[in-house]
Amino acid sequence: SSLDNRGYTCTQTNFDTGLRYQKLDQWAKFKDFQARIRDAIIKAQALNRIMIGWNGTSRAATSNPTTHPLLQDVNSGWLQKMRTENEARVMAEVVADSGKIEIGGGKDFENIDALVVSMVNEFIEPWYQEDTDLVVICGRQLLADKYFPIINKTQAPTEMLAADIVTSQKRLGNLPAVRVPHFPPNGLLVTRLDNLSIYFQDSSWRRHLL
């Protein structure tokens, strides 16, 4: 295989982090007060970057969190990159022009596990299909749809133990299921976690307290 040309453009992104006075008062007595503030800012920015990674679709000159609460207009995220640069590996529908994938008896797939197996078989090159680092990144709702029927009933102790084992493993299509913050609730992404990267310029962070 060959490497594709791909350029990157560094643009300024401003992150706002708010801490309530009540929280600051609670932390004020600790010797690591400044470190706590620093860590809170770093965590908030990291979660924002993850939100952009899953939901970002464009780069606006001035973002608007009111109309784009998931930071869709801050930058193009990983999923948007797939849609625009690797559309052949994106499954948006099974029936042409339906705009949806249906799961259940007599529908596109009998269950979500079959969908994941199909994704691996159809969209991932054969030499990567056996990669033991592949995972399924998914939204909370899809995991709930699979596991809620297992736990939402009265069970004998032996069945409870079996249910605990099944739900603790969290697998879809025999791949580990990974829940991450801000992922689209009804979406799936089969990949290696080290495929996901965020690039920023070294020594380019600036912080201003208001």
Question: Model-predicted segments: where are they?
Answer:
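Long, contiguous amphipathic alpha-helices that act as assembly "spine/axial" helices in icosahedral shell
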Residues: L3-R89, E125-L143, A177, L210
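Sequence/fold signature of self-assembling virion shell proteins
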Residues: Q72-S118, T132-V135, Q141-L210
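Generic recognition of flexible, low-complexity loop/linker segments
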Residues: N121-P126, I165
